Amino acid sequence: MIGDPDTRRIDSNERLIMPYPSPLKILLAMAFVVACWAYSPTGIHIGLQAYEPGHLALLRFLLASLFMALIAVFKGICLPHWRDVPLLFALGFFAVSLHHVALNIGQQSVSAGAYSVLAQSSPLFSTLLARFVFKDQVSAWRWSCVLLGFVGVVIVVSGDKGLGAFDAHALLILLAAVSWSVYFALQKHHARRYDGFSLACYAVWSGTLMLLIYLPGLGQAVLNAPLRVQWAVLALGVFPSALAYLAWGFVLKHVDLSRATMTLYLIPPTAMGIASFGLGERPTLLVLVGSVVVLISVLALNLERRVGLVRTARI
């Protein structure tokens, strides 16, 4: 009984004995997650100074894979079922391969601040997936939020480079947001048999395997890259790609999902601050206005879900 991890999760007596982390510890974990993921746009921008987008994605996740493998040795993970292997590779494709290659290519001509806002638009696409793929009912309120969100996206893009200079790079960042929405939907509907850490490991490892198509030329790129870029890529592999997922799993274990996701709205302003300090970028007024519009639309989507849960609980 003691050696069975599933029994430990449902044993009420043990739950009383296990110490609950202090609010400060949870708050620090949330702040760590925000800081890690807000660093990504700046880290990618620096990495692209010496690496091609595919090389940068592969190197970043080779580092993340090794780091998570070391943690898995000590922490332990759930072994996958053979029937779940296609699903795990699909998760890796949408969460790692497609998502990060699209982000890297997109950020070649999009500022780090605009990138951080566009990448946060994934809940808007999740709503579209819920309606047109999973055939869920979508309220008029949620449709209004989606429309408002896309208005904000247009404002961000026009404020960043101008609509006259609009090209496929911003669309690729939106593609990355769509990819993340598909990953989240697959995880929600089909991957409940695994804990968060195991699922993150398999998504990272399978996604990294698919990124190996970019292996030719990577060694020479590593040798030619300056030290500043190497440190930036190392930080990308360890912090946003590995440690942040562990910290996020810790947060979700002790805080309900709707409340925890509220902290993610701090990522775009934090990312803009990091980019301002590290890259000397100054977001334009239109980018700031569009950012507020996008974040309000996404926040309104989540608030509607939360109100619905409260009403259901009262009934």
Segments the model singles out, each with a brief description of its role:
Residues 2-58, 163-189, 312-315:
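Glycine-/small-residue-enriched transmembrane alpha-helix faces in small-molecule transporters
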Residues 19-20, 28, 57, 61, ...:
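C-terminal-most transmembrane helix of multi-pass membrane proteins
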Residues 22-27, 49-54, 58, 80-86, ...:
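Juxtamembrane helix-entry segments on the extracytoplasmic side of multipass membrane proteins
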Residues 36, 40-41, 69-119, 155, ...:
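Specific transmembrane alpha-helical segments of multi-pass solute transporters/efflux pumps
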Residues 55-66, 95, 100-137, 142, ...:
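Specific alpha-helical transmembrane segments that line the substrate/conduction pathway
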Residues 57-59, 114-121, 186-208, 237-277:
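Helix-helix packing/entry segments at the starts of transmembrane helices
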Residues 68, 89, 129, 138-158, ...:
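Hydrophobic transmembrane alpha-helices of multi-pass small-molecule transport proteins
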Residues 68, 126-128, 132, 163-219, ...:
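Transmembrane alpha-helical segments that form core, pore/gating elements
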